[in-house]
Curated annotation (Swiss-Prot):
Any GO CC annotation of this UniProt entry: host cell mitochondrial membrane
Name of the protein in question: Genome polyprotein
Stretches assigned to coiled coil: none
Region entry Important for fusion, spans: 149-180
Length: 321
């Protein structure tokens, strides 16, 4: 609503100036005033949708916070090497969102390649947006960062200055306040999922290629149960204060946004019932025959020869080919 007042001042002032133009002022002024009224109608619709619908009272500040993690990014990157373009999974500098001592928060669909000394090596992807140096997730600095963001959003909402804080945050997006800690390059050709390749990983990789933002949201939703336990055990006061305040005022959409922000950097993917299912899978796997080669023999002139040793589709997924 406060931003709408600024827009109304600009559009109405422009309409008044157009009306003072000699000869053509009357028609131009009328057209400009009609345009100003149209803008006002759009503002009223936005105010109704964001202020009166239950659970949808988003402030500009929270939308700005969410934008730093859900910016659509291409699932493939291209680097230029001596005039030749190569498709790579290595993150460019534009995909790096936040850097800590042992972790990098980046856009989904790539893996950071960090140069240390005279060698470049891939960091281990812990989540679609977080990579670490050695495969362990140091959450101390990332927790402090999320606590600060959510605490600031809660304070701005409680003081009814969300539009002002959101405007300041959006302007701050144009600048880099966090210094670069690592030298990221695109010379590693990292794999998004290192290790044994299974059918599930292949499907997840394809989903990240189709829609990185969808992959990000799904991964965060699956980590919410573990994130709730972590924020209580770790005493994350900024996040807890934000969830408590937004729950008391009935802004459940903001509660979900805070949970997604926290789960994106501070939990492992844990599905409810996953432990029981994993135990049942361990027992059932005892009876699996595993991957095997179906050897086909043919008889030619009284001699038997091997005709084919190719793996079928399921066997190829189990063996990792």
């Amino acid at each position: 609503r406060n931003l709408g007042k600024v827009i109304d001042t600009l559009t109405c002032g422009f309409a008044d100036l157009m009306g003072y133009i000699p000869l053509v002022g009357a028609p131009l002024g009328g057209a400009a005033r009609a345009l100003a009224h149209g803008v006002r109608v759009l503002e009223d619709g936005v105010n109704y949708a964001t202020g009166n619908l239950p659970g949808c009272s988003f402030s500009l500040f929270l939308l700005a916070l969410l934008s730093c993690l859900t910016v659509p990014a291409s699932a493939y990157q291209v680097r230029n090497s001596t005039g030749l373009y190569h498709v790579t999974n290595d993150c460019p500098n534009s995909s790096i969102v936040y850097e800590a001592a042992d972790a990098i928060l980046h856009a989904p669909g790539c893996v950071p390649c960090v140069r240390e000394g005279n060698a470049s090596r891939c960091w281990v992807a812990m989540t679609p947006t977080v990579a670490t140096r050695d495969g362990r997730l140091p959450t101390t600095q990332l927790r402090r960062h999320i606590d600060l963001l959510v605490g600031s959003a809660t304070l701005c909402s409680a003081l009814y200055v969300g539009d002002l804080c959101g405007s300041i945050f959006l302007v701050g997006q144009l600048f880099t306040f966090s210094p670069r800690r690592h030298w990221t390059t695109q010379g590693c050709n990292c794999s998004i999922y290192p290790g044994h390749i299974t059918g599930h990983r292949m499907a997840w990789d394809m989903m990240m290629n189709w829609s990185p933002t969808t992959a990000l949201v799904v991964a965060q939703l699956l980590r919410i149960p573990q994130a709730i336990l972590d924020m209580i055990a770790g005493a994350h006061w900024g996040v807890l204060a934000g969830i408590a305040y937004f729950s008391m005022v009935g802004n459940w959409a903001k509660v979900l946004v805070v949970l997604l922000l926290f789960a994106g950097v501070d939990a492992e993917t844990t599905v409810t019932g996953g432990s029981a299912a994993h135990g049942a899978l361990g027992i059932a796997s005892l009876f699996n025959q595993g991957a095997r080669q179906n050897i086909q023999l043919i008889n030619t002139n009284g001699s038997w020869h091997i005709n084919s040793t190719a793996l079928n589709c399921n066997d190829s997924l189990n063996t990792g080919w």
